[in-house]
Amino acid sequence: SSAASDVYKRQKEELLEYKRCMEDPLHFIQTYVKIVSLDEGLIPFKMYNFQKEMVGTFHNNRFTICKLPRQSGKSTKMISYLLHYALFNPSVNIAILANKAATARDLLGRLQLAYEHLPKWLQQGVMSWNKGSLELENGSKILASSTSASAVRGGSYNIIFLDEFAYVPSNVAEQFFSSVYPTISSGKTTKVMIVSTPHGMNMFYKIWTDAEEKRNSYIPIEVHWSEVPGRDEKWKKETIANTSEQQFNTEFECEFLGSIDTLISPSTLRRLTYRTPIQSNAGLDIYERPVESNTYLITADVSRGTKNDYSAFIVFDVTSVPYRVVAKFRDNEIKPLLFPQRIHQVAKVYT
C-alpha cells in the first residue's frame, strides 16, 4: 500500500539522516538543537563561525582549552557537542563540572531541554532523568557537579568538561587535577575541555600558557569579542561606560592580569615569565641547584594544613643583585609541626 511505502520511505530517509548526524556533529547541532533565547524563546541554534571551528577542534582533539569572552555562547555549543557525543557513542560517561554545582546543573538542564526538542527518531530511551544526572538507554551517562575532586574521583570518564575553570579556587583546581588526572590519562580517547574567561594567574593561566608554548597536549582556542556578531567599537564604548575599562579588559579582552587585585602591579607581572622547574617533588619545585660558594635566604609562611591556605617557603640566591628564586615549596596539607622539618631539609641542601 502507499501508506506502507511512505512509512518505509520515511524510515529510510530517517536512517540516512541519523547516519549523517552521527558522522557530522555540526550538521546535528545546526539542524536539530534548540536553545532558549531571552528575546524569542525556543529557537534553532545558529552557530557563529568561531563556534563551528571550536566544535571541529573538540571533535578531532583530546585536550582543548578555550579562553573566551563573556556572553559568547560558550556554554551552548559545549552542551550541544556533549549531547551529540552521548547520543551517538554508547556507554560513555560525561562529566559537566563548573565552579558552582548550581551552574553545572543549569548546563545539564539546558542539555535536557535540547534533548526534549529533538525529533523522536534521534532520541534514546531515558533510564534516569534528574537535576544532577542523566542516563540514556544506550548506557551513556552525564553527571553535573561542582569541580571538587570528590565529584569524579574513582569514576572513569570519556569527556570531562570544565566550565569557568579560572573561577575554581586554586587549591580545589590543583587537588582536582592531582586526583582526577590519572583516570583521564589512562584512557586513549578521553577528552578534556576547559572553558573559561580569565580570572587572575592561576591553574587556568598555567595550562593556557603551557598550551600556547606547546609544553602540554592542549589545543588553545582564543576568541576575540569582535568575532561575536553585533559587537563593534560602539558596543565596546557603551560597555565600558556601563562597567569599567578594567572589567572590559578582563571579561571581553580576556586579559589575565588586572582580573583580580594583585599586590604587584599588572605591568610588572606581565614582564615575568613562567619557568619550568628542573625538578618537582611533593610540593617542592627546584629551579637551580645549590652552588657551594653562593649565599641563600629562605622566607617562609605557615598555615594550618587543613587543605585551605598553603604553607610555603621560597629559597632565594642573594649572592648578587638581582636576587633569584632557586626553589619554592607549597603544600596545603602539611601540619605546622612538620613544616619546620621540611624547611630544615631544604636549608641544609642550600648551605
Provide a role label for each language-model segment.
Residues L136, R289-E292, K307, I314-T351:
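Nucleic-acid-processing active sites and adjacent nucleic-acid-binding tracks
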Residues K12-K67:
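Conserved pre-motif I regulatory segment
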Residues V92-L111:
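Conserved Walker A/P-loop ATP-binding site and its immediately adjacent core
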Residues S1-Y8:
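Short, small-residue-biased leader/transition segments that mark boundaries at the very start
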Residues L108-N158:
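Inter-Walker segment of RecA-like/P-loop motor cores
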Residues Q175, E227-V302:
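ATPase catalytic-site recognition across NTP-hydrolyzing enzymes
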Residues L113-H117, Q123, Y167-T243, K348:
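ASCE P-loop NTPase helicase motor core
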Residues N61-Y81:
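Walker A/P-loop
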